[in-house]
Amino acid sequence: LKFVVLICLVIMASTSAQQCGDETCGAGTCCAVFSQNHCRRLSQMYDLCSDHSDASPSGNYLFFCPCEPGLHCDRNTWTCTEGSSRSE
């Protein structure tokens, strides 16, 4: 039984992690590319952000992470805000 629990934990950890250069990004973070790749926390209210659709094929973002759940990246100001994800 302990072995089954251990296998489940390993699977859960591997699905929530993202390889980012020499680091592995966990939940609540993304891989942001500057001169090198770095794990950064997801952008919060009024932080600068990238849109989820701006991820590279490898899942990395340029400079900033997308917003945390419940927020969206306003493409006019490039900051995380509440409300609809449509630009108006």
Swiss-Prot record:
PTM-bearing positions, type Pyrrolidone carboxylic acid: 18
Tissue distribution of the protein: Expressed by the venom gland.
Residue span(s) of the pro-peptide: 86-88
Domain of life: Eukaryota
Coiled coil ranges: none
Pfam families with a match to the protein in the record: MIT_LIKE_ACTX (PF17556)
Keyword list, A-Z: Disulfide bond, Pyrrolidone carboxylic acid, Secreted, Signal
Primary localization: secreted
Record-annotated disulphide pairs: 20-31, 25-39, 30-65, 49-73, 67-80
UniProt entry tagged with the keyword Signal: yes
Subcellular location: Secreted
Signal peptide: 1-17
GO cellular component term, pick one: extracellular region
Gene3D superfamilies, alphabetized: Lipase, subunit A
Family, as annotated: Belongs to the MIT-like AcTx family.
Identification of the protein by name: U1-hexatoxin-Iw1c
Protein source organism: Illawarra wisharti (Illawarra funnel-web spider)
Upper classification of the organism: Eukaryota, Metazoa, Ecdysozoa, Arthropoda, Chelicerata
